[in-house]
Amino acid sequence: MNSEVERPSFLSLPDEIILSCLARISRSYYPKLSLVCKTFRTLLISNELIVARLHLKTHETFCHVCLKFPDKPNPSMFTLWIKPGTILTNQLEKNKRSTRDTRLVQIPSSYYYNVPFYLVMVGSEVYGLSQRNDPSSNMFVRNKGDIFLCKAPNMTVARAKASAVVFNGKIYVMGGCMADESVNWGEVFDIKTQTWEALPDPGPEFRFSSIRKIDVFQEKLYVRSNEKKDSVYDPKEEWRVVKGLDMLNRNLGCGTIEIVHYGGKLLILWDKVDLSHDKDIWCAVIALEKRHGSDEVWGNIEWADIVLTVPSSYVFVNSLETGF
C-alpha cells in the first residue's frame, strides 16, 4: 500500500524555534508575514519576540502611524517600510512620484486610539492633559497599576490642546493659550517637587499658540508649529532658530505635520493634495547639528519621499516610535 509521506511544515516546529527565526528577520517584513497565518500573527505581536530580538541584538527603530479613513469604523495602523539596500535621496522639488522604496505599510491590528488626553509617561506614572477644545488648566496622573486618573497640580494657565514632552524627569508644556501670554506660554512641571515653573519667553518670533509637536533631540527641545516655524530650546541656554530647512518649509504648506524621534534623528510627516485631489503623505528624515565655532543649529534633510497616498478626507490620529 502506497501512501504519500507528509512533508514537515515550518509551523510544526516549536514556537521557540519559530520565534528565533522571526527575531532574525527585519521588521520591515512583519506586516506581510502577519498575513501568512494566525500563528505568525500571534507570535509577531508577542512579548516573547521582543525579548528574543533584544537577546539577539537585532532590535530596530521603527515609526508607526495611526490614520482614520472615512469608510472604516476604526483607525488603521501603518509602519514605515524602507526597502533593504536602498540608497535614500531627497525627492523634494523634483516633481517626481514616489520611488516606492519607502512606504507606509498597513499593519493588521484592532488597535483603537480614542483618549481625550495628551498622555506622557514619567517612570511608573502616566500624566494626562486635556485635548478638548475648551481651555483647561487641569492635569491628571495615574500609576501603571491603577485604573483611574487622579487630579494633579494645575498648570498656571488654561490651555486647549497643548503639546507636552518629558525631558530629564520633567514635563514641558507649550502652546494652547494666547500667543500674547508670554509669561505663561510655556511652563515646566517638576515631578519631584510637584510644582510648575514658567519657561523663558521665546520672544514674538517664536511665540505661536498652535504647536504641532515637541520632541527631545540631543538634550534639546525641538518645536514645530502650524505656522511652519522650527525652533530649538535648550533648558540650559535659550531659544534658537533651526536653519537650513527652507526647502522643507516651502513644501510643508498647511498639511498635517507630525514629528517623531527616529533613530537619533527627526522624522517629519506631512501631507499635500495631489493632481487627483487625494493627498500624498510625505516623510523626511532630518539630522540636526551645531556648527563648530557657532551657536547656530542647522538641519540637514537626509531623505524625503512620498510614502502613502490617501483620500483627502482622512484624519491623522497619532504616531509612535518603537525600538525592538
Swiss-Prot record:
The keyword RNA-binding does not apply. Residues 7-54 form the F-box domain. Keywords: Kelch repeat. GO terms for cellular component: cytosol. The keyword tRNA-binding does not apply. InterPro entries: F-box-like_dom_sf (IPR036047), F-box/kelch-repeat_ARATH (IPR050354), F-box_dom (IPR001810), Kelch-typ_b-propeller (IPR015915). Gene3D superfamilies: Kelch-type beta propeller. Kelch repeats lie at residues 170-216. Pfam families: F-box, Kelch_FKB95. This is Putative F-box/kelch-repeat protein At5g28160. It comes from Arabidopsis thaliana.
